[in-house]
Amino acid sequence: MKVIKFNGLVFDYSRTFLSKSNLQTLTKLARQRDLIGRRKDMFTGEKINKTSNWAVLHTALRAKRSEKIYVDGKDVVAGVYEVLGRMEDFSDRVRSGKYCGYSGKPITDVVHIGIGGSYLGPRMVTRALAAHHHPRLTAHFVSDDIQETLKRLSPETTLFVVVSKTFTTPETLGQAEIAYNWFKAKGGKSAKHFIGVTVNIAGAVKWGIPEENTFKFWDWVGGRYSTWSAVGITTMMLVGAENFYKFLDGGRKIDAHFRKAPLTKNIPVMMALIGMAHRNFFKYPAYASIPYPPQLEFFPLWLQQLDMESNGKSVELNGKKVKGSTGPIVFGLLGYDAQHSFFQWLHQGTDIVPIEFVTTMDNRNCIFQANILHAGEKNAAEPQNNLPGGRPSTLLMVKEVTPETLGMLMALYEHKIFVQGVLWGINSFDQCGVEMGKLIAKKLAKK
């Protein structure tokens, strides 16, 4: 049976058309590409992002305190827990009402300003864990048009979280400037209403954020993997440190599974191999991410960036043009909304697109959709009502969406995408297309 279970999570790939021969070919490729060695390199801090000569250690953000992981001779886990401790202290003070605005009133609104991974991940996680939010606090995530958000807020009780890895991102700093000017114009009197999350602490301080209100992360944390770091401080303020640690624990459990399970019993590896078969053997150009729990409203957008920015590459690590296809198009929507928008195309369109369902185990509607997409519903008498079937799908099932299961789901996809990058021979941890676009935009702005 094509089902793998781990820690209450079920991965069902019985509705795919992955043959034994396909699987053997891909597992052979995994060994040829030294997946086991590359996996070890990532977890132990080797500088596998060759473009920037950086380690790739988002996994260290959720490591146990007792672990030792070294980059350039320095134990990074100790630094992670130092920042986590500061985050916890700050979050506890905001939640308890001890951290007040300039007029002495407790904080009621947290405005998180960021873009890309500094926005999509934290927004998704904070929305997914809404059941755990502090009743006094409301989070507002902004990447553009902060003016609309500011109309609803009071400067006395608003805290701004400015997130930029370099603290030079023009879109983010532009929105932060608007927020600062609004704050001052409304009578705001204290810089304590602003905190900064960045690699560039000096840049945040120069911008005007008090140093005690800055929270560090590191160059070995990619933006699209940064929610586990201080970038997640808005989430921690809303859900509390205890739930944030449970979220980290979920990711850590998948890390252990990914490192230890045999390839064909390894959920992220099998997710990757199935995705590669769909892309390279069956030539499917895309896949749809369809979560059914309403808490996962923003999951497809988070996944879209994670996958397409990581594996949307056409050059191998050796600088040569890739042979064949790499990362697919990723799109998606909540299950019931998707059923009443583009499921018509999925069921009866001329293109076949695999679906990756994420659901709770009690959702029969999702399983019914997967069955019909796979098996079809024949109706020769009325061709317009004929459902041809032959549409592959996978199911990731959890009992419920909790901080722990959310962490597990996210880590599964992170590792899936890493495996695919290894097998395609590309660097999943740079984004040269994005960076070149920024440089060109800056040049045009100067003209």
Give residue spans per PLM region.
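Glycine- and acidic
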Residues: 67-79, 107-111, 135-141, 156-168, ...
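Short glycine/proline-enriched loop/turn "hinge" motifs that connect secondary-structure elements
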Residues: 151-154, 349, 385-388
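Glycine-rich phosphate-binding loops that contact phosphosugars or nucleotide phosphates
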Residues: 89-97, 103-261, 439
